[in-house]
C-alpha cells in the first residue's frame, strides 16, 4: 500500500453527506464575515410578524430568497428559544455557493441546508424537524464588506406550556390567520393538549399540533425566554384572559364593598380627597361671591352718578328758563 494509510471507506460518504449541511465538516468560521457581526442599529433584525404554531415533529423548511449577486454573502441567523443568548449562523458565499460558516445545521435536529442559484434570484434554505429544541426565530441576512442587513424573520413555536390556577379555567384559542404579534396555526381544530398534572396549586397543560412523526412534547418546565413574549402576546385575547378580567373586576368590587372602612390608608386617602374637594368648592364660591359683590357695587355707583348727572341737568334747565322769563 506504499507505506501510506488509506482513508476509511466511509469517509467519501461522509464528505458527500456534508455537502447537504448534515455535518459540520465545513470551512472554519470567517470571523470578519459581515453576516457574523451584529446587525447595525439602522438595520436591526426585524421583529417577527406572526409566530406560527406548526405540527410537532414534522419537517419544515425556512427559505430565504435574495437578488442574485447583489450581496457577496447570504446567511440564515438562528436564535433558539432554549438558548436565546447563543446565535447560530449559516453563511454562504453568494458567488461561489461555498459555505463560509455553519454552526446552525449541526446543532438543529435533522438540520439540512441547500443553496440554489436560479439566475435572477438565489435561494438559501434550512430544513429541520420542529420540536421544542428547534423552536425560535430564523432571520434572513445579507452581508457585504461593510455591514449586514436583515430582510425577514420567521418565528416558530413547537408547543405552549400553560399553568392554570385551580380556581380558574382557561380555554386557549389560537387564530387561524396570520396576525401581527399573535400566535396562529393554519388549522386550529387540530390543537391538542397534554395533561401534565399538578404543580402545587397550578395545573400544567401543554398545547401542541400533532404531526405525522408521532413525536410528543415533554412536560418538563423550561423558561424559553425567547418564546415567552410570543406566547404571552398571543394568548392575551383568549377566554382565559377574559375570565381573568372578570375575576379582577369581582375582586375590585369586593374591595370597594368590604375593605373600605377597615383599611386606614384608604380612609385617610378618602378623607383627604373629600377635604381637598371641599376646599376647592369653598374657594370657588368665595371668588364668585367676591366678583358678584364687586360688580354690584360698581353698578350701583354708576347708577348714582347717572342720577346725579340727570338731576344737575334738570336744575340747570330750570334756572335757564327762569332767567329767560325775567328778561
From Swiss-Prot:
Q: Does the keyword rRNA processing apply?
A: no
Return the Low complexity bias intervals: 305-319
Q: Residue ranges of region Disordered?
A: 298-327
**What are the UniProt keywords, alphabetically?**
Glycoprotein, Signal
Looking up Pfam families in the UniProt record yields:
UL141 (PF16758)
Carbohydrate-modified residues are: 144, 239
Superkingdom: Viruses
InterPro entries assigned to the protein according to its UniProt record, in alphabetical order: UL141, UL141-like_sf
Q: Which residues form the signal peptide?
A: 1-23
UniProt KW tRNA processing keyword? no
What is this protein's name?
A: Uncharacterized protein UL14
